[in-house]
């Protein structure tokens, strides 16, 4: 299909679309059947996103417009148009339940920021390029005032709606006072910074809700169920995920997410349950085992009788917990808000008294000018912006100023084990030859040959080990997967077995006393043993372990030295493994075999005891605890989307040492903010009464007012250059 053909289609009675523009990797398409239909907008986004080379796609149901950003080198534009045609015929019940991506962008907010930036730029050019006076002429002042009112409208509306002397009233008073005294530049600068902060905070919340919604619906829009009655009993049919009911027999194929909680009634499989337990190593399940929605069948096929569906599944409860925890988070009462509650009404009273007693309008204007809390409004956002920029350069992504404040106060930290205190991917620790004709290198080489086509993490670890040792992997003729046990391979005319001790027992391979002692020893050390047999004879053993991060012990020691009183390790692993890891790291408190609800309970319990709690994790199962903690920290942007979106801080480079930097930066940011408030409040408070006494002229008041703002910005800028130890 060419662009010309697409334009011809638009003239037909079929679902129409017109390519409005297509240049420089950006295509805009007008689709009439998307207009006023958010669900169809989602369909188009889903269809186009599957095309190779497409980077971002936004569908706007208000206008019927779709904007696609793509790579001109990698993307076939005809496939985009074909995807749109196909999206027109998707059944309504198969459309994912979510909002269009364009809902993350509110044009009016972007417009306010853009107009504010443009106005500040023009005022700067006027003052410093054309050397014009500070005071604006009438026409320019009217335009600037209009821009100020437009950019400050949300705050003005909030102050009028709630009628309280909070943040909105603080900003509104500053805006009105600045307009009266012709301080348009100050008003615009403050409003522009605050608009950016409000926009980013709102955007983060919307993205979090979208990530959580995607988690609940999963990647599966449909499920296969087996009919149990009627003339078609035994037939497997595909149905929308929303129509699956409790008691249905759900068929789950390889590499597909399990859509329901339930009991396995037929089949065997290796299942990755990391979305629930947080543990990367898959487990074997068979008839009688209980499985959870969100788990993925790595290998095999299962028949599951549904016991919970939708929001009532374990993964659904995780979503609910996250949403509740986010809503329960108490708002932090900043110094600026507390100051405004007292100072703003006081300034009005003092100015009114001054006017009543002196009848001097200029003195009253001086009081309002010196009382204008613009410097107080700048105290936090400038420091936070500098600190966040400093952290970003070091791979610390902080989502808001309140989280910086909490980072410096944390005195209890919870760690998820897998992927946080440990590396999160198993490595080979021992290779033992148990036959005189076999060397450890041969054992590893042929073991890798057996695992070469497997996607199991243990298999990947064995193969990585051969690459690290530069050992060639011999070919094999045929292989067979023994679900839950291991692999059977035929190579060089011999039969190779690699797997658990249970596999060798089932195949009647004799396991020597030495090998049994090795197995017991390794399990006690939290390592996984794989036995290797050739033609019915045990010839070697390989053990694997999820290694503790090399920096973990030192980081924990430094955290204790910095004032952290409680460190607790949480894991879904067996108690023996948890105990061994905790002992190695010197952790006295740990919880094993915990579910997401249990992690959340530990957070709540510590908070009830009076601790400021930090939670460090990287998985979906950590999300409720990350949201409920006073500060949630996601380890690595490679972690799950929900963990990263829910957390208050994300560590991009996956290094535990960054935890120390978060704490250090948070403490330093709080110090700077306090200094800013001290300076600005002192100037406002002293200036209020000095101005009322007539010791200041409006010009001096304006100079003092601007000087306090400059001092606050200069003090905050020190955070940009602050060096973390």
Curated annotation (Swiss-Prot):
Corresponding gene?
ctpC
Q: Give, as one word, the top-level EC class.
A: translocase
> Which residues are noted in the entry as Mg(2+)-binding?
416, 418, 618
Q: Which reaction does it catalyse?
A: Mn(2+)(in) + ATP + H2O = Mn(2+)(out) + ADP + phosphate + H(+)
Sequence ranges assigned to domain HMA in this UniProt record: 25-92
Give the EC number(s) listed in the UniProt record.
7.2.2.22
- Give the record's membrane topology: Multi-pass membrane protein
InterPro entries membership: ATPase_P-typ_cyto_dom_N (IPR023299), ATPase_P-typ_P_site (IPR018303), ATPase_P-typ_TM_dom_sf (IPR023298), ATPase_P-typ_transduc_dom_A_sf (IPR008250), HAD-like_sf (IPR036412), HAD_sf (IPR023214), HMA_dom (IPR006121), P-typ_ATPase_IB (IPR027256)
Biological source species? Mycobacterium leprae (strain TN)
**Keyword annotations of the record:** ATP-binding, Cell membrane, Magnesium, Manganese, Membrane, Metal-binding, Nucleotide-binding, Phosphoprotein, Translocase, Transmembrane, Transmembrane helix
Q: What is the lineage of its organism?
A: Bacteria, Bacillati, Actinomycetota, Actinomycetes, Mycobacteriales
Q: Which Pfam families match?
A: E1-E2_ATPase, Hydrolase
Protein name (Swiss-Prot/TrEMBL): Manganese-exporting P-type ATPase
Q: What does this protein do?
A: High affinity, slow turnover Mn(2+) transporting ATPase.
Indicate the transmembrane segments per the record. Answer: 101-119, 142-160, 165-179, 188-202, 335-359, 365-383, 669-688, 698-717
One GO molecular function term of this record is: ATP hydrolysis activity
The Swiss-Prot or TrEMBL record describes its family as follows:
Belongs to the cation transport ATPase (P-type) (TC 3.A.3) family. Type IB subfamily.
Domain of life, per the record?
Answer: Bacteria
Major localisation: membrane
NCBIfam families on file: ATPase-IB1_Cu, ATPase-IB_hvy, ATPase_P-type
**Gene Ontology terms: biological process:** copper ion homeostasis
């Amino acid at each position: 299909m060419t662009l010309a053909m697409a334009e011809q289609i638009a003239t037909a009675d079929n679902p129409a679309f017109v390519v409005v523009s297509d240049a420089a990797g950006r295509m805009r398409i007008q689709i009439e059947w998307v207009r006023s239909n958010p669900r169809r907008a989602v369909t188009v986004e889903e269809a186009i996103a599957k095309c190779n080379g497409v980077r971002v796609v936004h569908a706007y149901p208000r206008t019927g417009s779709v904007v696609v950003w793509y790579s001109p080198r990698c993307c076939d534009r005809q496939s985009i148009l074909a995807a749109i045609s196909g999206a027109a015929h998707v059944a309504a019940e198969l459309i994912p339940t979510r909002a269009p991506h364009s809902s993350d962008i509110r044009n009016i907010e972007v417009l306010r920021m853009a107009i504010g930036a443009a106005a500040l730029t023009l005022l700067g050019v006027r003052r410093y390029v054309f050397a014009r006076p500070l005071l604006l002429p009438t026409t320019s002042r009217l335009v600037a005032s209009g821009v100020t009112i437009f950019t400050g409208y949300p705050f003005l509306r909030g102050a009028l709606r709630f009628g309280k002397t909070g943040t909105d009233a603080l900003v509104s008073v500053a805006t009105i006072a600045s307009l009266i005294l012709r301080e348009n530049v100050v008003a615009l600068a403050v409003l522009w910074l605050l608009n950016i902060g409000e926009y980013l905070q709102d955007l983060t919340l919307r993205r979090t809700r979208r990530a959580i919604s995607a988690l609940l619906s999963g990647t599966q829009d449909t499920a296969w169920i087996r009919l149990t009655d009627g003339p078609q009993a035994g037939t497997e049919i595909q149905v929308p995920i929303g129509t699956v009911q409790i008691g249905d027999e759900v068929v789950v194929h390889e590499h597909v997410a399990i859509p329901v909680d339930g009991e396995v009634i037929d089949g065997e499989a290796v299942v990755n349950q990391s979305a629930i337990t947080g543990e990367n190593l898959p487990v074997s399940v068979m008839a009688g085992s209980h499985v959870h929605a969100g788990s993925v069948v790595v290998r095999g096929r299962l028949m599951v009788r549904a016991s919970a569906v939708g929001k009532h599944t374990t993964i659904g409860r995780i979503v609910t917990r996250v949403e509740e925890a986010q809503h329960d988070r108490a708002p932090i009462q900043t110094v600026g808000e507390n100051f405004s509650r007292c100072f703003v009404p006081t300034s009005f009273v003092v100015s009114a008294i001054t006017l009543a007693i002196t009848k001097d309008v200029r003195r009253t204007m001086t009081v309002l000018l010196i009382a204008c809390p613009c410097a107080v409004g700048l105290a936090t956002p400038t420091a936070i912006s500098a600190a966040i920029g400093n952290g970003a350069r070091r791979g610390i992504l902080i989502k808001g100023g309140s989280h910086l404040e909490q980072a410096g106060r944390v005195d209890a930290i919870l760690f998820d084990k897998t992927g946080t205190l440990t590396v999160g991917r198993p490595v080979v620790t021992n290779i033992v030859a148990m036959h005189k004709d076999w060397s450890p290198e041969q054992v590893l080489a042929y073991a890798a040959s057996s695992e070469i086509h497997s996607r199991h993490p243990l298999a990947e670890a064995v193969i990585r080990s051969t690459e690290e040792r530069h050992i060639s992997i011999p070919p094999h003729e045929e292989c067979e997967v023994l679900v839950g046990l291991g692999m059977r391979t035929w190579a060089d005319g011999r039969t190779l077995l690699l797997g658990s001790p249970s596999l060798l027992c089932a195949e009647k391979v004799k396991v020597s006393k030495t090998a049994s002692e090795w197995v017991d020893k390794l399990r006690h050390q939290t390592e996984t043993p794989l036995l290797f047999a050739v033609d019915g004879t045990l010839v070697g053993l390989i053990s694997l372990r999820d290694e503790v991060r090399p920096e973990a012990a030192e980081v924990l020691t430094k955290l204790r030295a910095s004032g952290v009183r409680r460190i607790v390790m949480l894991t879904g692993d067996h108690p023996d493994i948890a105990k061994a890891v905790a002992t190695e790291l010197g952790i006295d408190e740990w919880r094993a075999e915990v579910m997401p609800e249990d992690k959340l309970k530990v957070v709540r319990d510590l908070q009830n005891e009076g601790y400021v709690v930090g939670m460090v994790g990287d998985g979906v199962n950590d999300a409720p605890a990350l949201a409920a903690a006073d500060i949630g920290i996601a380890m690595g942007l490679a972690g799950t989307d929900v963990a990263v979106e829910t957390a208050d801080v994300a560590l991009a480079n996956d290094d535990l040492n960054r935890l120390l930097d978060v704490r250090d930066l948070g403490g330093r940011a709080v110090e700077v903010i306090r200094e800013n408030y001290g300076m600005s409040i002192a100037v406002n408070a002293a200036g209020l009464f000095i101005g009322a006494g007539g010791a200041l002229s409006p010009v001096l008041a304006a100079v003092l007012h601007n000087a306090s703002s400059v001092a606050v910005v200069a003090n905050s800028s020190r955070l940009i250059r602050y060096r973390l130890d």
